Regions:
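Alpha-helical transmembrane segments and membrane-interface helix-loop junctions
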Residues: 1-157
């Protein structure tokens, strides 16, 4: 399930990164030919936000965020699993608060409108925060379960 979630989230990130790229391209071309298209900047900014947040959550699952891993590289077995459990618990707590406060941001800004496209609500942008938080929490809890299996000798290191 976690791998399917990651693939979906990665695909979503790629879609938003593609929208970002296309919006920037449209902006460059229209400026070159002297036509003013005002919505491209907002579309580029907001699609980039979604792409970054989806990618950040995937990086939690893949453990690709910047970290000081000297100690985790030196430890083996149950000691390493214990340390990784603590680290993932901290990430899970952080993800919980991102979800909680992200939800508050969504409810606060839901009815605000985009400047260039007033038909669209800002809530669609802000919802990326709790989506990222929930998926980070799922990934962290999945890691914790794996570490607990190692600690209980149910899985090899």
């Amino acid at each position: 399930m976690v791998q399917k979630l990651e693939k979906f989230q990665m695909a979503l990130g790629v879609i938003f990164l593609s929208i970002f790229f296309i919006a920037i391209l449209v902006q460059i071309v229209t400026r070159y030919i002297g036509v003013s298209v005002i919505w491209t900047e907002e579309v580029a900014n907001y699609s980039f936000i979604w792409a970054i947040f989806m990618g950040a959550a995937v990086m939690v699952n893949r453990r690709e965020h910047f970290s000081f891993d000297f100690l985790t590289q030196k430890l083996k077995g149950k000691k390493r699993a214990s340390l990784l459990t603590v680290i993932d618990a901290i990430v899970a707590i952080f993800a919980f608060f991102i979800t909680l406060y992200g939800y508050e941001a969504v409810t606060t800004f839901w009815n605000y409108n985009w400047l260039s496209l007033p038909e669209l609500k800002m809530g669609y942008i802000w919802i990326a925060i709790p989506v990222m938080g929930v998926t980070m929490l799922i990934y962290s809890l999945n890691h914790i379960v794996s570490h607990i299996k190692v600690l209980l000798n149910k899985e090899a290191v």
